Amino acid sequence: MSNKKQMAVNMFASMLTYAISMLISFFLSPYIVKNIGVDANGFIGLANNFVSYASLITIALNALASRFITINIYQNNYDNANRYFSSVFYSNTFLSLILALIGSVIVIFLNRFIDVSDALLPDVRLLFAFLFLDCIISTISSVFGVATFARNKLYLNSLRTIEANILRMLCIVILFSCFEPRLFYIGIASVVQVIYCLVLNVIYTKRLLPEIKLSRHSFHFRMVKELVSGGVWSLFNRLGQILLDGLDLLITNVFINANSMGILSLSKTIPTAINGIVSATVSIFSPNYTILYAQGKKDELLRSIKQSMKIMGVITNIPVIILVICGKEFYALWQPTVDSDVLYKLSLLGCVCIIFSGGINCIYNIFTVVNKLKANSIVVILSGLV
């Protein structure tokens, strides 16, 4: 399959994935709010944020794993590819133990970190516990996601995501229908979803990368050090992103109240979905960039970047325009029990950054491809501090 055709297939699958994800969210969110209330619903986003804060410790190791493994595969250096693969897996297993410790502390002392009523505390604790378990499983298994990246078959990831999202939705509906509605059912469904993804990723690895074998004898601390020394700048980049948009729910919970946090969480649904579309589309270009760089085809790489920027400009602007025109009416229909005017204005504020940065997002992949993340990371973290 040619590069253009492969990219088209990957992009179509990615767009289909997000269309289905948004449809599921469109019907599932009101269902959840109706059953557990807007206050309780806000804790879902907050719990996910806490997990993302804790998972920062994994970024330095994993940010460049796909890059190093893919480049070694296309340079026919399978011994090194195996060393990177095994080193990442066993290092992630160790990091998962640290995540388990962090998660345990947060769950046990949860009411000291956030404002939560006594009635909701047991449910919120279980929600946090299951979402941390989700994160731990995802961390251990993340290296198996390299297979579809290395072979530029990201459409397989998209199909897997569609199946996993449908499975998650079914779990939530079944649990809410058969038992008394509880907040932590969301966490149970997430664990089922990540286990399904793990199984498929292992299958894809065996099918697409038969040369790659997991072995403790292939673990090399030198490989870990090399990955971390470059990936640490991705950690700073992620910290900058959190400072930019990842603390809003926590700040709202601590300084205002849980109800306001719930409203803000709902208003972030569409901006988050648009960001997801942008991120998913950007990720489609990354394997091709990495493969062309590994093969030394710099002119083709430059043409690919220019083409990607044109595509991103279109994909970014269309959903933002739709939100501006139809957003207020959409929220009035989607969440009739919540002030649609407030949701609309908060959503517009959440999309301001997307308008200016969406079209050039694909360029950020180049920093990872050439393993020169320092300059970009410094700019992002300074922006977050400002």
Report the location of each language-model feature.
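C-terminal transmembrane helix end/exit motif
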Residues: M1-K4, A19, L101-I108, V146, ...
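Interhelical loop/hinge segments that connect adjacent transmembrane helices in multipass membrane
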Residues: M1-M7, P122, L183-G187, N201-D245, ...
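Membrane-interface junctions at transmembrane-helix termini in multi-pass inner-membrane proteins
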Residues: K4, I136-E163, V173-I174, F184, ...
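Helix-terminus/linker motif at the lipid-water interface of multi-pass membrane proteins
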Residues: F26-A40, R112-D115, F176-F179, I242-A273, ...
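Helix-loop junctions and terminal segments of transmembrane helices
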Residues: P30, I59-Q75, A150, L209-P210, ...
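Hydrophobic alpha-helical transmembrane segments
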Residues: S158-L208, K268, L382-V386
